[in-house]
Every structure is written in structure tokens, then in C-alpha cells.
Design a protein with these regions (language model features):
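His/Asp/Glu-enriched, well-ordered alpha-helical/loop segment
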Residues: 240-247, 289-377
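Metal-coordinating catalytic core of metallo-dependent amide/deamination hydrolases
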Residues: 133-254, 259
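Active-site gating loops and adjacent loop-to-helix segments of metal-dependent hydrolytic enzymes
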Residues: 77-107, 141-156, 220-247, 267-270, ...
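Alpha-helical scaffold segments that flank or form the walls of functional sites
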Residues: 60-61, 80-143, 165-176, 431-442
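N-terminal metal-binding scaffold of metallo-dependent hydrolase/deaminase domains
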Residues: 1-48, 61-62
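Acidic, glycine-enriched loop/beta-strand segments at the rims
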Residues: 13-24, 37, 281-282, 348-389, ...
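C-terminal cap of metal-dependent C-N hydrolases
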Residues: 365-420, 427
């Protein structure tokens, strides 16, 4: 018999598109599925099994789990600071890729997924290497993961993944762990992949009905270089190569012109917005308001641990709003409800999971987060016409305020502690793996 959990008497923000609030409200889960959402009395009217778990959510916000639409697992946190993007890639990131082993890569994914889950993330799109280990990590931890191997085939990048290895992972992990673990096709960058790789990826995406993920237009240099090499701006070149479409998710998209925005909108291509990374690397502010106005699905991404430097999507929401405001010199943009939508339902739409996750609705999977509002920095909590919890979640709360996380109805975080795996063992192994990685990297650069 399926387990039953009632999250009762919280402040429920379902994020189903209507800005509804049930205050107080409840969420009833049966097995992996949401079976009731609403006011306390309405949900209480549902029959409850004698062995049902009842979680008292008084003074807690109850929201859908967060969707991280662009992540790189890694172990370079706190290194290569205060450097320009392409200098940083060549000096630190690419040498680390050369030194990477499957064992180190798996340790990095276990660290990233555990860190994200602890902070309320239920789904990640991870572009990484040796991703059989990432699949094991996601299955053990319980998080949803879209695995996107770094594919590169141009000269000088032979240490990345290939379309052949990506296809092998797609065939073995197309829909694994009861659908929680999926594989997409990953094209590292326009300057790392040949036109033939783009064409083959588009062909495979259609054949396997799967997604494509890549980076674009993170810096002005990329735009200028694309014009020099191809005579087209990056998104125009993507269109020319045939990869734009409803299956495609493009990270960053900072320096797009009006025509490129039109191309994304017309083709149904989605965007992963990474505000912390774009600020830290001084890449610039993406035109998120224009994207959304054009009907483009825009999700939030943390990017990697080295360019953020954490994987806290609660914090990412605050920076997404503040970056929008200061770049437009307009305090009315970056509305908390819009930002919450980007982190939940819009992120699920951008990654093809909106039928499954992203909002608290009957029939969807029970991906739920509770946030403890009994904090100095979250006081006062106001109700009715003065309701301020949406603003608190975006501007005041952080991942450390997350109390519990359910994925597919399984409670993976309880009282702020990850229960599905031994988080301390994962941290210890990641520390060892990082030391090994830097030793290997040093040996390679000294030869």
C-alpha cells in the first residue's frame, strides 16, 4: 500500500500560475503523487489512513521543489577567482577536465546533488563528464537529474565527451530510476563543436525524443567571434545549424539582440538564466524581462560551484530579482512571484517536466519543500492583505531555512538534514577527490 503523508497547516504557495495562496493550507500525498492541495478544512475532509504521516507545517511556507536548469558538477570552488571567463576556462577549467577521472567526477556529482537537495532543489540539469557515476549519485540521493555530457569534437578538445559516449548514456539512462534520471544531448559550445556535431545532435534528439542543452552568448566576445567566424550571431548560428526548438535549453543568453529573442520565441527554445554566475564573471545582465514577454520559458540555474560559488537556488532567486532591477534601473521588475515561478514551474517547463513537477497540483508528483519561517530574518510573517511570504522567500530566505524536501513523495530532507544518504561521508569523499584532482592537474601542467 502506498505511503500517505499530510503536510498540514502551512502557508501553501502552489505556483500553478494563478498566484494562489492557501493560508493556512495543506498538501496530501499518496505514494509519489499529490492527491489534494488547498485550505486546511478542505484537505482534512479527505479520508486519512491510520498509518499516515502528518507533518505539522505551522509557521512554514510550503512550495514546489526548486528546479536548477543549469549546473556543472565540479570541485573547483574558491579557485580561479577574479578572472575573465575565457581566461578562466583556459587556465583552470579545461586543465581540470584533462585531469578528471570517473571516480572524481562521481564524487563531484554526489556533492553537488546533496548540496542542492539540502537547499530545496528537487531537479537539476547537470552538464558534466563520466556521467554513469552521476546517474548512480542521483539515484542514491533521490533527486531528479537530467544528465547532459559535455560533448566537444573540435581539435584541442579531445578530452571532452563524444556524441558516441553521450548516445551510450542516452541508451542506458534515457528514463532511469522510475523516470527521475534522464539523459539529454550536450553540446558544450559553438566554439567547441563542429557543424556535424550539431547536425547529429539534432538528429538524435528527434530519434530519441530527448533534449539538447548548450551554452550561448555569455560574453560580448562570443558574439563578436561568432560574427567573425560564421557571419552570424550565436543564436542565429544555432538556428542555421538546426538545433533550436522545444527540446532545446540554452544557458546564459546574456547578449542577445531582438532578432535572436524572436528566434528563441518562434522556435519554442527555453533559456536557463544564471544571475550569480553572470555577475561574478562580469558577463552582463540577460534580458530576462524581454524573454518572458516574448513567451520564452526561463528557468533559473546556479551554474557550477566555481562560478557561483554555491548551489543555493533560494539565494539565486534574490540575485535574479536584484540583477533585473539594477540592470533596468526599474524597481518594478523582478517581482517576487515572477522569480518564484522561474525557480519552480517555469524551470519545469524549460526542462520538459511541467507535467510532472514544478507546481503543487493534484496528479503531479509530490516534489515539495517546506521553509521554516521562524527566523529573525524572516520576521514578521504577515497574512491576508499584507501577505509578505512570497517576498520573504525571494529576498530574505536561503537554503539553510529549508526544513524538509520530498521528491516523488519520499522525504529526503528532514529538519534541515539530508536523510537519503550520509552527507558527511559525501563531503569527506569530495574533499579527498578534490585533492586528488588538483594533484593530477598540477602533474599535467608541469609536464
Amino acid at each position: 500500500m502506498a505511503s500517505v503523508t499530510l503536510i498540514r497547516n502551512g502557508i501553501v504557495l502552489p505556483m500553478e500560475g494563478r498566484r494562489a495562496v492557501f493560508d493556512p493550507g495543506s498538501v496530501l500525498m499518496e505514494g509519489p503523487t499529490v492527491v489534494a492541495v488547498g485550505e486546511v478544512d478542505a484537505v482534512d475532509a479527505h479520508p486519512l489512513a491510520a498509518d499516515a504521516e502528518v507533518v505539522d507545517a505551522t509557521d512554514h511556507a510550503v512550495i514546489p521543489g526548486l528546479h536548477n536548469t543549469h549546473l556543472h558538477s565540479g570541485l573547483l570552488r574558491g579557485t580561479a577567482e577574479s578572472m575573465a571567463l575565457w581566461e578562466w576556462l583556459e587556465a583552470y577549467v579545461d586543465p581540470a577536465h584533462k585531469a578528471l577521472t570517473p571516480e572524481i567526477a562521481e564524487a563531484a556529482s554526489r556533492l553537488a546533488y546533496t548540496e542542492g537537495l539540502r537547499a530545496g532543489t528537487v531537479s537539476v540539469v547537470d552538464m558534466w563528464r563520466f556521467m554513469e557515476g552521476s546517474a548512480r549519485a542521483a539515484e542514491d540521493i533521490g533527486i531528479r537529474a537530467t544528465l547532459v555530457p559535455y560533448v566537444a569534437d573540435l581539435p584541442g578538445y579531445d578530452y571532452f565527451e563524444t556524441l558516441e559516449s553521450n548516445l551510450a548514456l542516452l541508451q542506458s539512462h534515457r528514463e532511469a530510476a522510475d523516470g527521475r534520471v534522464r539523459t539529454w544531448l550536450g553540446l558544450e559550445h559553438l566554439f567547441y563543436c563542429s557543424p556535424e556535431a550539431f547536425a547529429r545532435a539534432a538528429e538524435l534528439a528527434g530519434e530519441y525524443d530527448t533534449g539538447i542543452h548548450t551554452h550561448s552568448s555569455e560574453t560580448t566576445w562570443e558574439v563578436d567571434e561568432s560574427l567573425r567566424r560564421f557571419g552570424r550571431r550565436p543564436i542565429e548560428e544555432f538556428f542555421h545549424r538546426g538545433i533550436l526548438g522545444e527540446r532545446t535549453l540554452v544557458a546564459h543568453c546574456v547578449w542577445l539582440d531582438d532578432h535572436e529573442i524572436e528566434l528563441l520565441a518562434e522556435t519554442g527554445t527555453s533559456v536557463a538564466h544564471c544571475p550569480c554566475s553572470n555577475m561574478k564573471l562580469a558577463s552582463g545582465p540577460a534580458r530576462v524581462g524581454d524573454f518572458r514577454a516574448a513567451g520564452i520559458h526561463v528557468g533559473l540555474g546556479s551554474d557550477g560551484e566555481k562560478e557561483n560559488n554555491n548551489l543555493d537556488l533560494m539565494e539565486e532567486m534574490k540575485f535574479a530579482s536584484l540583477l533585473a532591477k539594477v540592470s533596468a534601473l526599474d524597481p518594478t521588475v523582478g517581482d517576487p512571484w515572477d522569480i518564484l515561478e522561474m525557480a519552480t514551474l517555469a524551470g519545469a517547463r524549460a526542462t520538459g517536466l511541467a507535467d510532472v513537477s514544478g507546481s503543487l497540483e493534484v496528479g503531479k508528483r509530490a516534489d515539495v519543500v517546506t521553509v521554516d519561517l521562524r527566523r529573525l530574518h524572516l520576521t514578521p510573517v504577515l497574512h491576508g492583505p499584507d501577505f509578505n511570504v512570497a517576498a520573504h522567500l525571494v529576498f530574505s530566505a536561503g537554503g539553510a531555512d529549508v526544513d524538509s524536501v520530498w521528491v516523488d513523495g519520499r522525504r529526503l530532507v528532514v529538519g534541515g538534514e539530508v536523510r537519503s544518504v550520509d552527507a558527511e561521508a559525501i563531503r569527506t569523499r569530495a574533499q579527498e577527490a578534490a585533492e586528488e584532482l588538483f594533484d593530477r592537474r598540477r602533474a599535467l601542467t608541469e609536464t
